[in-house]
Amino acid sequence: MLALRPLISALIVVSSATPLIGAPDAAGNFRAAVATVDITPSANKWLAGYPARKSTGIHDHIFHRIVALDDGRTQFFLISSDLCLFAPSVYDEMTAQLKRETGIEPIQVWWTVTHTHSAPEVGPHGLLKLMMPERYNHEPDQEYTALVEKLLIDGIKEARAKLAPARLAVGTGFSAANINRRARDVNGHISLGLNPDGPTDRQIGLIRLEHPDGTPIALIANYSMHGTALGPENTLITGDVPGTVAAYVEQKIGAPMLFINGAAGNLAPIYTVQPSFNAFHITEFDVLLGDRILAANNSLAMGTSQVRLRPSESVVETPRRAGLGWDKSLGNYLHAASGEAGTIRMPVRFLFINDEVALWSAPVELFCEISINVRDHSPYPHTFYFGYANGWLGYLPTRQAFAEGGYETQTNPFTEQVENDLTNVVIAYLEGHAR
């Protein structure tokens, strides 16, 4: 069993950029493109993330932002959608239709969400209804779900059609825009709140796609933070902090920015669950996070056109919590005989870029300590975790958090064994594929 490294309360990351060493057999063949598709509904919708409530208007529009990558042999598509979450069956349905229309395989597609809690519900309620039935006494919105899926497929086709010669650069930055949200009382009771002494991950992971002349195609910014600056009283559709910061950075650089959430399971924005936009200035995050992304971008070295992409997948099998039911649409994610709790089959995706960058993703709300531990043990100079990817199977807390209790330890189908099961598989996979 892999020992977990002790963590300090905040990970201090100095802005840095490591030039990528090009892959000789893919020299100069790299192409990239981006597409942005508006998915703002025209009617009021049930909003995800808090107790059931319907939208009453629109504060800012929400989008699919789609990047297409092509190294001459492999194409890969990364999506950031201004949504809260969706069941893995939605991803499976969308990618099956995408394959029928385009031949693109699911392994080539990562569909992440920013986790804003002020966007419409998408897809069947899945595990959420088993864990929080009081929130889901209404029917899923099949019409909006179908629209979101269609617009995404259209956007992937658009990005693919626009592929053009490009370069890729990678680096990191730092932002103190997040805070641990597992507040601890004098009696040790854990509740949702703010805990400035708790673990955080404040690294910004950055990937820049640029034209051969150096002008930007798109920026991919990876940062860990719940999309909960607005609380349940807000009923206006909004991208929350991720959408606000993306729009700010886009205005500054003249190109789209994909906000890719990270291990935000126990991390909140430092200004959180505000009742309305009148109660605070959400644009403060343009300074706290947006300007830090821009500074990290300015520190990146010139990108390389010598890029090799290696997408792959592993499956983590881990025990299911006893007494928890299962959603019939998620049969592919559970292995169990009749009457047994069985094991959950959690897909973990990887994308290796040359020999310097490892991206990994999972359909969970991961605690930041786990992502940091993987990064510390990774043989790659840059290891970024892309969270909320390809569906949602619940929170994935640490073993210590399971012992302490709290909201996240009940809103998942796992046992306290899951941290070690995931960590051991991911680190072994990274070590086994290092070159």
Show where each model-derived region lies.
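Conserved beta-alpha junction segments in alpha/beta enzyme cores
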Residues: A23-T112, T116-L258, G262-A264, I270-V273, ...
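Anionic-ligand-binding alpha/beta catalytic cores of soluble enzymes and soluble regulatory domains
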Residues: L289-G290
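N-terminal secretory signal peptides that target proteins for export/translocation
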Residues: M1-A3
